[in-house]
């Protein structure tokens, strides 16, 4: 399946299609959207965002704890969309506060 991903970035919202077997960060980059990242392996917080609608599968990541995931935080480099999803990007500072 392919889902609509809406990213709320500091420069405004962007919307693109993302297959359910492709990481959101990778799909965003393929379509020309520049997002923060570092390790690309789910092991840091550079690419952190916050899911405000929809669901993702980020079981490949290991950096976030259960409370952070429950609060909606997501690592876009290891997140697959499970539905149409809205994510606020650039949330590393909020995550590590």
Curated annotation (Swiss-Prot):
State where [2Fe-2S] cluster binds.
39, 44, 47, 77
Q: Which cofactor does it need?
A: [2Fe-2S] cluster
GO annotation (BP), single: electron transport chain
> How does the cofactor attach, per the note?
Binds 1 [2Fe-2S] cluster.
| Residue ranges of domain 2Fe-2S ferredoxin-type in the record | 3-93
Q: Which residues form the signal peptide?
A: none
Q: What is this protein called?
A: Ferredoxin
Q: What phylogenetic lineage does the species belong to? A: Eukaryota, Viridiplantae, Streptophyta, Embryophyta, Tracheophyta
Q: Which family is annotated?
A: Belongs to the 2Fe2S plant-type ferredoxin family.
């Amino acid at each position: 399946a392919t889902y609509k991903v809406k990213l709320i970035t500091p420069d405004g919202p962007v919307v693109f299609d993302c297959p359910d077997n492709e990481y959101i960060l990778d799909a965003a980059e393929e379509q020309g959207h520049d997002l923060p990242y570092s390790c690309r392996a789910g092991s840091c917080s550079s690419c952190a965002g916050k899911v405000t609608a929809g669901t993702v599968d980020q079981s490949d990541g290991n950096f976030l704890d259960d409370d952070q995931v429950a609060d909606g935080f997501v690592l876009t480099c290891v997140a697959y969309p499970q539905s149409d999803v809205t994510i606020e990007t650039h949330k590393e500072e909020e995550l590590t506060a």
